[in-house]
Regions:
Chain B
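Structured catalytic-domain cores with a bias toward divalent-metal coordination
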Residues: 2-338
């Protein structure tokens, strides 16, 4: 393992925001893995730390393939993590909306540029990502339909689902998009936590990455072969919205099967404690995303359901 | 005895709810969209609708929108003053004016730029989605309400970090259609910039694509109101209203703006972390090549780390407001004639 500072942002009173990279193996740029881009992505940082720990052991046992190099960057936003802010704290800018970056611009764009210079050219790019709304997903691999996406490769992570989506304008300035447009097969992995650590899904994410790296001939690691993924397009997921507001009780978890008419959530009056709404499933299917916060506002998306799919 | 119309009922309700005095019959406050919050509160996006007394429905319509970013307040004063002047002289109104004073009320209440719960920039979710999450749903309803306008003006106030001179910003894709309006907006500067995909999710881009010509104005700095800049823009808005046949008042004197298409914009970035101290005082404006824009200083060792010098004869139209800076921070934009 070789540890190096890829880029550093000089602080005024704080110590420099150093972006640290961990390289394993030597030779061809095989795979690059990025952890927390946002300051609240603690699960994503934790997954990277566990991955680095495992790769260190694998390297010591000669299990990194000849002429293959892996780069892991646990975070680019140490400043944000330490003050519990999602974005780059100085000007409140989302670094993952600054790619491919610009060295003649503000610090978030410089960070993006420096990071992109370090991480481009790899055959495979993997980012542990998060969603802006509070909720849990079934762990899955997500890719944008840029014309360069490869769902069959995404299948090799062995997670249950691969989700593809058409990029929106705001997606065109993300790392994943820039990676794909510059020849890297890019994947985002979503687990079911962001600002807390969920050990179970973190282990699942580490295993998925090691499974993928093994199947691509980058490491030698013997683990369970996982699932043959179902590939779904995001627009096929049926959103279920809350048509009222109050305390929220979710009755189904990600991965649970539901049937048309099942009561899947309750909304309770925040002052009087009465159930004011029972929300029913509009379809048969599997819960893919579930809102987690204890309260809900009107029109919030509380579930996304994979329609007409059974366990 | 005549029964009240639905519109009159809404008007009566909103007058009671917001303690508005009905001093004339030209305005009507409507709820464009509302969202219930978890505990006994509703977020309402309001608009104040003005039309002439004997409206035919064929009048030209201007929509004035602001408050997409909760930390931008100049638009609040602009709305107040435009409404005040229309109410003071309803006889001069010959078209429709819809004023949308705040698209992000939660952000404004907290002084936050985005939607506070998600830290989501609302000007990156247009044209919205009726089946989407809260922000996208609100965005879709706002867009639906504005459609049909002959012109929309989206008033912005930079952010809390950068101060801007009064300017109109146009995407080059729409420049042909919008430049005639931009030139009579009483702005110091009209900046035609090249198209970037991420901006396609702004209100202005979405409305322009949907056939509503939409101008974006920028001025001042976040969380402050600059009265002089506001008055300048208000004159520009009334000038446009006269041009569209919406207002029969006396035409205000408006300045001819400097056009970015005739020169180039230089971006000046910090080379060091430190404190930026401007040498320009309160006002931005004309500057000569080699003149000092400011310094980056080190408060720890009492040294000047970098002197910021104008690269050309021109005007400074953007200037760093928050003195705390990092390497790369944008300090100024200088426009120079080629």
């Amino acid at each position: 393992m070789h540890k190096e500072v890829l880029f550093s942002v000089e602080g005024l009173y704080r110590e420099d925001n150093e972006i640290t990279g961990y390289r394993f193996g030597h030779g061809e740029k095989a795979a690059c893995i990025i952890g927390a881009m946002r300051g609240n992505e603690l699960q994503q940082l934790y997954i990277c730390s566990q991955l680095i720990r495992t790769l260190k052991t694998l390297e010591e046992h000669g299990a990194i393939s000849h002429n293959k190099e892996i780069l892991v960057v646990p975070t680019v936003n140490m400043y944000g993590i330490n003050v519990e802010k999602r974005f780059w704290p100085i000007d409140n800018v989302d670094i993952n909306r600054c790619f491919p970056g610009d060295m003649n611009a503000d610090s978030p764009k410089r960070i993006a540029k420096a990071l992109f210079d370090s991480v481009q050219g790899y055959s495979y790019g993997i980012q542990f990502a998060s969603f802006y709304m509070p909720g849990d997903f079934i762990p899955h691999v997500r890719m944008m339909e840029t014309g360069f996406q490869s769902p069959s490769l995404a299948n090799l992570f062995g997670l249950q689902y691969v989700v593809t989506r058409k990029p929106k304008p705001m997606d065109t300035v993300t790392l994943n998009y820039s990676w794909q447009m510059n020849g890297t097969n890019a994947f985002s992995i979503y687990t079911n936590a962001t600002d807390t650590v969920d050990e179970k899904s973190a282990r699942q994410a580490v295993s998925a990455v090691l499974r993928f790296l093994t199947r691509m001939g980058i490491v030698k690691y013997n683990n369970h072969s996982g699932y043959i993924a179902s590939v779904i397009e995001e627009h096929e997921l049926m959103p279920v919205k809350s048509d009222t507001a109050g305390f929220y009780k979710r009755l189904k978890e990600p991965g649970d099967p539901v049937y048309h008419g099942d009561v899947i959530a309750q909304v309770t009056d925040p002052y009087e404690g009465e159930i004011i709404k029972e929300i029913k499933s509009p379809t048969d299917g599997i819960i893919f995303f579930a809102h987690t916060a204890p309260m809900v506002m009107e029109n919030a998306v509380i579930y996304k359901i994979i329609r007409r799919m059974h366990e | 005895m005549s029964f009240p119309t639905i519109a009159h009922c809404i008007k009566s309700y909103t007058m009671i709810r917001y303690n508005y005095l009905c001093i004339n019959e030209v305005d009507m406050i409507n709820e464009v969209v509302s969202v219930k919050m978890p505990v006994k509160e509703k977020i309402r996006i309001l608009k104040n609708h003005f039309e002439p007394e004997n409206a035919t429905g064929r009048e030209a319509r201007l929509s004035l929108v602001t408050g997409i970013h909760g930390d931008e307040l100049d638009g609040q004063y602009v709305c107040y003053e435009v409404i005040r002047q229309i109410k003071a002289h309803p006889e001069l109104l010959t078209g429709t004016v819809d004023v949308y004073p705040c698209i992000n009320p939660l952000g404004m209440d907290m002084g936050a730029r985005g939607i506070p719960m998600f830290d989501l920039d609302m000007n990156r979710v247009f044209p919205g989605d009726n089946n989407g999450a809260m922000a996208e749903y609100v965005a879709a309803e706002v867009v639906n309400d504005i459609i049909g306008s002959d012109l929309c003006i989206d008033v912005h106030s930079s952010n809390v970090y950068i101060k801007e001179a009064p300017q109109v910003r146009l995407n080059e894709d729409c420049a042909d259609k919008l430049l005639p309006y931009a030139k009579i907006m009483n702005a110091d500067f009209v900046w035609v910039y090249s198209s970037i995909t991420v901006r396609e999710a702004t209100l202005a881009y979405s409305l322009n694509k949907l056939g509503v010509p939409t101008l974006v104005t920028e001025m001042g700095v976040g969380l402050r109101i600059n009265n002089a800049y506001c008055r300048q823009l208000i004159d520009g808005i009334f000038n446009i209203m006269i041009e569209l046949g919406i207002w029969q008042g006396e035409r205000p004197a408006v300045k001819e703006p400097i056009m970015s298409t005739e020169g180039q914009v230089d971006f000046i970035h910090a080379e060091h972390a430190g404190l930026f101290v401007s040498a320009l005082g309160e006002q931005m404006g004309h500057i000569k090549k080699g003149e000092r824009i400011g310094d980056i200083i080190s408060p720890v060792d009492g040294e000047i780390l970098q002197e910021i010098i104008s690269p050309a004869d021109g005007i400074v139209f953007s200037l760093r407001e928050n003195p705390v800076i990092y390497k790369g921070t944008l300090l100024a934009r200088v426009y120079a004639v080629r």
